[in-house]
Amino acid sequence: MTRVLALPLVLVALVAANATAAERPFHSTVRPLPAQLRADLTGRFWRPGCPVSLSQLRLLTVAHWGFDGSVRIGQLVVGREYANDLRGVFRRLYDLRFPIRHMRLVDMYGPASSRPTGGDVTGSFECRQAVPSPCSGGSGTGNWSNHAYGRAIDLNPLENPYVGCGRTRNRSAARYLDRSRLRPGMVTPAVVRAFSSIGWGWGGAWTGDTKDYMHFSVSGR
């Protein structure tokens, strides 16, 4: 008689979880901005005089991993000419199981009451000036940010703060100033390589006292 060994419940659950993950291949789409999204952006995040028109932007939808180990659906508004390349980047991040905390349109563009209380929103397009280093004061540089063109992404801003002269404007991110102790959601060399594969640079590689660890862009600035 052949004996059938019963697997421990924990092992069964682990196998099932791994099977579920394996059955969820990466997927992504790119499409023009829907009418409602155009309306939501107009006035607060886009206005006449911005360096790109709404028709030059695309809605990028991607699968990504959350901090809880589940697969989620995230969305970004990005420049039309960069959308397909970014699909490849997020596929690589998915394969790395790199966690992204918040990446929904309502997190970025919704009313203040609907945004995550802790921030940490991964986003791309926003018609605004570049933000000066924490080393200096002020809220704008007088120059368009790469975000104003949809050609930059800020990835997990809490875990990857904008740092200048050893400090950051986000007090909650101060515990991530020490980049030698790697924690979930922090940018790794593999993440940098995913973006560099399409020619994008990383703010964490800037020389001098200012580093923008969240920031990836077509120009590297």
Model feature map: region roles:
Residues 41-48, 71-80, 86, 135-140:
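N-terminal post-signal-peptidase region of extra-cytosolic proteins
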Residues 62, 125, 153-155:
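Long, contiguous hydrophobic alpha-helical segments, chiefly transmembrane helices and signal peptides
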Residues 52-120:
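Active-site acidic/histidine clusters and adjacent loop/turn architecture
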Residues 137-221:
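Catalytic cores and adjacent binding grooves of peptidoglycan-active enzymes
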Residues 65, 88-99, 128, 158-161, ...:
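Structured segments of extracytoplasmic/periplasmic soluble domains
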Residues 1-22:
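Secretory targeting and sorting signals
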Residues 104-148, 160-162:
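Active-site-adjacent loop/helix surface patches within enzyme catalytic domains
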Residues 21-70:
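N-terminal module-boundary/linker segments of secreted carbohydrate-active enzymes
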